[in-house]
Amino acid sequence: MKKISRRNFLLASGAVTISAALTACGGSSSSTAPASSAAPASSAAASEAPAAGGKVLNIWCWNDEFQSRFNDYYPEVKEIAADKSTTTLNDGTVVKWTINANENNNYQNKLDEALLSQDSAADDDKIDIFLIEADYALKYVDSDYVLDVKADIGLTDSDLAGQYQYTKDIVSVDGSQRGTTWQATPGLFAYRRSIAKDVLGTDDPTEVQTYLSDWDKFNDVAAQAAAKDYKMLSGFDDAYRTFSNNVAAPWVDGTTVKVDPNIMKWVDQTKEYTDKGYNNKSSLWDSQWAADQGPTGKVFGFFYSTWGINFTLLGNSLETPVAEGGKEEVGNGIYGDYAVCEGPQPYYWGGTWICGAAGSDNIETIKDVMQKLTCDEAIMKQITMDTQDYTNNEKAMEEIAASDYSSAFLGGQNHIALFAEAAKKIDMSNAGPYDQGLNESFQNAFKDYFTGNVDEDTAKANFETAIKEKYPELTDVVWPA
C-alpha cells in the first residue's frame, strides 16, 4: 500500500484547504483517510546526501525541551549562541533552531509547508531533524517525508535494543522505524502531600494509592476533599488522558469518527465534578491551572506523565521562579509537598520523537545525534539523574528504580520506580494520525456543556462541525449508544 499522499498528508493536520492541497500535489483527487500501512522507507533521499555532509543542521521543534537536552547532553556541542538560536558543534557544523509553538496546529502547519518545499530548498535551508508528538506521529511516519532510522540513517538493532518497545512501535510502519526518542512517558497521579494528609490522614504514596486505585474510589475521595474545601482536580481536562488512553479502538475507522464509550465516561465525570464543585473550571495550560499547582492552590492532585513532573509541575510549585532568582529547594513555595501514585488507570501522555527529514544532507550527523541522545545508556541515565525526566532505556531506568535515588521535589520519593512499572503497561495500539486534532476538538466542544452554556446534544453537534471543518475527508461521526 502506498504511503500518505501529499494531499492527505496536509489534510491529516487540517493545515490547508482542499484546493491548496490539490495544487500542492498536481491535482490529485484522492480523498481517502491516511493509510495505516506504508511501503518500505525510500532510501533515495539518503543516497542523495553528500558523503561529506552539510555544515548547517536545521532542527525544527515546538518548545525548548529538546533544545535543552541537545545543548546539555550531546557530546559534540562546542558553543551555544547567547540567544540560543544556534549551537555550534566541534566539527564546525552550525545547528539552527526553528521553534514554532504548538497552539492551534501552528507547529504542524509551518512544518508541513516547509516539508512540501524540501525538494526545492537550498541544502543549508533543508530541514534535517524535526520533532513529533505521539498524538500526530503516524501522520508523519506514514509519509515520504521521514527517513527510516535503520535503512536510511544507519542505526542498528543493537543500538535500539535498550529502548521501550512501545516507543519504537508508535513510529513504525510495516517494520520501518521512522523516529527515535530519548524519553518514555508513562503517567501517574501527582498529589499534594499536605492535602492528602488532611483529607485521608496519610501522605504515604502506597496508602494514598489504596484510596485512588479505581474511579469509584477516586470519586469518593473527591467528595471527601470537597467537604474540606479542596478541589479534587483543577479543571475540565485533567483526567482526559486517563480515559482517552484506555479506549477500545482508534478514533477513526476509514472515514468515520467513532467516539469511544470511555471518552463519554470522561464527559460524565467532568460534568459531575463541575456541577458539584470538585474542580476549579480551569483549562489545560491556562493561568488558573498553573496557579492551582502552586503555593496558593487548593487542588488535591494532577494527572501528569514523566516530563510534566520536572518540566511543568516543579516550576509551577515555586513561590519565586528560577528566572527571578528562586531556587529549586524546600522552602520555595510548595517544593517537596508533592508525591506520586499510580492512580485509577494506567495511561501515557505525550512523548517527543526525533525524525530525520528526507532530503537532508547531514545523515551522519543525524545518526550520531540519535545514537548519543536516544541510545547511549550512560547519557540516558545521566539525563534522568539530573532532570528527573524518565528516559528511554529500560536497563538504566530499572537500575535507578532499584537504587536509593530520591527526588527532593517529591518529598524524597523514588518516583522512577513507579514510572518503571507504569511504562510496562503503555499500549499505543490505538494511536492514529488524527489524535491531536480530535482530542482537542472534543475537549473544546464539551467545555460549554460542562459550564451549562449548551446541552449535551449541542456539544456533540459542535464537535461534529469542528472536526468536519478541520478534516473534510472525515464523513461521519458515530456516538456510543
What are the residue ranges of the model-derived segments?
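Beta->alpha turn/N-cap motifs
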Residues: W62-D64, I132-Y136, F236-D238, S287, ...
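Long, aromatic- and glycine/proline-rich binding clefts that accommodate carbohydrate-like moieties
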Residues: N332-G336, T384-N444, D448, D476-A481
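A local structural motif
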Residues: K84-E103, A122, D203-V208, K271-W285, ...
